[in-house]
Amino acid sequence: MGSAALEILGLVLCLVGWVGLILACGLPMWQVTAFLDHNIVTAQTTWKGLWMSCVVQSTGHMQCKVYDSVLALSPEVQAARALTVGAVLLALVALFVTLAGAQCTTCVAPGPAKARVALTGGALYALCGLLALVPLCWFANIVVREFYDPTVPMSQKYELGAALYIGWAASALLMCGGGLVCCGAWVCTGRPDFSFPVKYSASRRPTATGDYDKKNYV
């Protein structure tokens, strides 16, 4: 596979991972708990995310409430907000940097400098994946630890939500895509010019007398 194809494939993976990271950041399903009371009519499921919590009744009715106070949130939620939003914004910067250094664009003159720009964009994407992985694993560790804690009531035990799995998949795509972009750019760092070759045909000049060569006539 050519270096340009590697860059394009890596950029596509990074874009999909970026969308998945935004989705994981906004979904209120980082922690999910399902419990049943003695009366099945009161069965409900509670979802908790970074920005709101939702309660889904057995009848299908869902009620969500946005967190009112930032200071009242737990430290892991505040840190997860900062790291996840930072990763999303950094991925946006990485997108522009990668597009500027990609071989299929003309934002930067072809050469080793252009390859280094693309290499920087791929490294930023990989950093985004690692940055998003920190709050995801931190949250998962807290949920699992509290789930097996005998002192926590059964009604307050949570399980891993779908947003965590989406975030893990997005982080993997960002790191893999960033690695592919770096591989495609690394191949071109030693080339003086890696732009697509364009062949030009030489124009025919007239003779000194202004007349065309006689052999052009039949």
From Swiss-Prot:
<dbReference type="InterPro" id="IPR004031">
    <property type="entry name" value="PMP22/EMP/MP20/Claudin"/>
</dbReference>
<dbReference type="InterPro" id="IPR006187">
    <property type="entry name" value="Claudin"/>
</dbReference>
<dbReference type="GO" id="GO:0005198">
    <property type="term" value="F:structural molecule activity"/>
</dbReference>
<feature type="topological domain" description="Cytoplasmic">
    <location>
        <begin position="181"/>
        <end position="218"/>
    </location>
</feature>
<feature type="topological domain" description="Extracellular">
    <location>
        <begin position="144"/>
        <end position="159"/>
    </location>
</feature>
<protein>
    <recommendedName>
        <fullName>Claudin-5</fullName>
    </recommendedName>
</protein>
<dbReference type="GO" id="GO:0007155">
    <property type="term" value="P:cell adhesion"/>
</dbReference>
<feature type="topological domain" description="Cytoplasmic">
    <location>
        <begin position="103"/>
        <end position="122"/>
    </location>
</feature>
<keyword id="KW-0472">Membrane</keyword>
<feature type="transmembrane region" description="Helical">
    <location>
        <begin position="82"/>
        <end position="102"/>
    </location>
</feature>
<comment type="function">
    <text>Plays a major role in tight junction-specific obliteration of the intercellular space.</text>
</comment>
<dbReference type="GO" id="GO:0005923">
    <property type="term" value="C:bicellular tight junction"/>
</dbReference>
<dbReference type="GO" id="GO:0005886">
    <property type="term" value="C:plasma membrane"/>
</dbReference>
<feature type="topological domain" description="Cytoplasmic">
    <location>
        <begin position="1"/>
        <end position="7"/>
    </location>
</feature>
<keyword id="KW-0965">Cell junction</keyword>
<feature type="transmembrane region" description="Helical">
    <location>
        <begin position="123"/>
        <end position="143"/>
    </location>
</feature>
<feature type="transmembrane region" description="Helical">
    <location>
        <begin position="160"/>
        <end position="180"/>
    </location>
</feature>
<feature type="transmembrane region" description="Helical">
    <location>
        <begin position="8"/>
        <end position="28"/>
    </location>
</feature>
<dbReference type="Pfam" id="PF00822">
    <property type="entry name" value="PMP22_Claudin"/>
</dbReference>
<keyword id="KW-1003">Cell membrane</keyword>
<keyword id="KW-1133">Transmembrane helix</keyword>
<dbReference type="InterPro" id="IPR003551">
    <property type="entry name" value="Claudin5"/>
</dbReference>
<keyword id="KW-0812">Transmembrane</keyword>
<dbReference type="GO" id="GO:0070830">
    <property type="term" value="P:bicellular tight junction assembly"/>
</dbReference>
<dbReference type="InterPro" id="IPR017974">
    <property type="entry name" value="Claudin_CS"/>
</dbReference>
<comment type="subunit">
    <text>Directly interacts with TJP1/ZO-1, TJP2/ZO-2 and TJP3/ZO-3. Interacts with MPDZ.</text>
</comment>
<feature type="topological domain" description="Extracellular">
    <location>
        <begin position="29"/>
        <end position="81"/>
    </location>
</feature>
<keyword id="KW-0796">Tight junction</keyword>
<comment type="similarity">
    <text>Belongs to the claudin family.</text>
</comment>
<feature type="region of interest" description="Interactions with TJP1, TJP2 and TJP3">
    <location>
        <begin position="217"/>
        <end position="218"/>
    </location>
</feature>
